[in-house]
């Protein structure tokens, strides 16, 4: 099987374990830092540099990958997310709109550009699979996730809209996987991410899904075993997305439901 990847370490490793031949892609800056090259050497694959917001770059990724792999691509993974507003610690009611544009372009519109580029080039084989990684904040409010929640909501919408078109014309599946919180570069700037990680792990009946388990699920979505699954957002979070309030959380918060205030005595909502 031939697979094209946009930066997802564990999934790349798992795909190669299953016999896939892949290419990797990341920003030129990330490649210069050496980590992607190290993964490529480990997996015996090539890296194609690209700015995910550039249609020209994305078209080059697909063209080059088809040359390297010797034909159309079977599976594609979109695993990209970044918010300048989160990095600059701007709250949702004080966003910089230029930064918001960048958040949406990098984290969601890049998904549309990627699929559109692939479709115009006929780069993905019939009955192929496209997957993007999302998060429950696209559908539920998580204070601190900020404009990344808007980006993930857009990401999921793109999967539905493009999934219909690509499915009708080429039987290509397009889905998003809403993964448990994981410690990533994109999530590192989210306030309280470590506490959210612990909270969701305790709330979920099965606990958080790990990065390795996410990779396993992605492989299933790439496979022919899910040939009729498309236009879906699939929760892979140990059940967290369906839990209202666990008994443990209820007992804990019953002991400490005082209003949360800042150093000036102002109530902090969230």
State the predicted function of each range.
Residues 19-36:
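Conserved glycine-rich Rossmann-like NAD(P)H-binding loop of the short-chain dehydrogenase/reductase
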Residues 37, 41-44, 48, 54-59, ...:
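Conserved mid-core segment of classical short-chain dehydrogenase/reductases
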Residues 5-6, 81-168, 178-184, 207, ...:
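Catalytic loop of short-chain dehydrogenase/reductase
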Residues 57-60, 102-117, 213, 220, ...:
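Conserved mid-core alpha-helix of short-chain dehydrogenase/reductase
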């Amino acid at each position: 099987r031939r697979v094209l990847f946009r930066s997802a370490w564990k999934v790349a490793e798992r795909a190669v374990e299953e016999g896939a031949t892949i290419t990797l892609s990341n920003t030129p800056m990330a490649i210069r830092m050496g980590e992607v090259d190290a993964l490529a050497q480990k997996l015996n694959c090539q890296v194609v540099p690209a700015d995910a917001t550039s249609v020209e770059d994305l078209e080059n990724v697909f063209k080059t990958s088809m040359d390297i792999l010797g034909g159309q691509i079977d599976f594609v993974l979109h695993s990209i997310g970044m918010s300048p507003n989160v990095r600059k610690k701007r709250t949702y009611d004080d966003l910089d709109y230029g930064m918001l544009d960048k958040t949406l372009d990098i984290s969601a519109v890049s998904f549309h550009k990627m699929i559109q580029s692939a479709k115009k080039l006929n780069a993905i084989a019939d009955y192929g699979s496209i997957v993007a990684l999302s998060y429950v904040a696209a559908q539920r409010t998580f204070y601190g996730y900020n404009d990344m929640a808007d980006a993930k909501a857009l990401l999921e919408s793109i999967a539905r809209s493009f999934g219909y078109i690509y499915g009708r014309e080429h039987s290509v599946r397009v889905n998003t996987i809403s993964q448990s919180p994981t410690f990533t570069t994109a999530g590192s700037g989210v306030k309280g991410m470590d506490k959210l990680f612990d909270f969701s792990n305790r709330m979920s009946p099965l606990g958080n899904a790990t990065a390795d388990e996410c990779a396993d699920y992605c492989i299933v979505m790439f496979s022919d075993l899910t040939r009729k699954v498309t236009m879906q957002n699939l929760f892979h979070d140990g059940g967290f997305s369906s839990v209202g309030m666990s008994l443990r959380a209820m007992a804990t918060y019953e002991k400490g439901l005082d209003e949360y205030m800042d150093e000036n005595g102002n109530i902090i909502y969230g």
